[in-house]
Amino acid sequence: MLMNWTDQGVKSVKDSPKRFDAARKLAQKGACELRDFYMTIGKHDMIAVLEAPDDEAAAKFVLSPARGGNIRTTTLKAFREDAYRKVIGAL
């Protein structure tokens, strides 16, 4: 999940760690796990690696923090190495 702070999010950036802690708990309730988190410099302000049981659970999780108005998200689905090898092997 690629994230950028909104103007509102930048104004309250000191609260960002608290919001992240709440997001981690929210992920767990939805059977998801925030595996990694990075603050970045460049096009995106933050990157989080979310593991979810299915696309629906991931979508529900992603929409919840975004509703607060502090971040905008861009999602992408990644394939682990074993899945990558399976896909390429089937070509």
List each model region and its residues:
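A compositional/biophysical signature of low hydrophobicity enriched in polar/charged and small residues
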Residues: 2-91
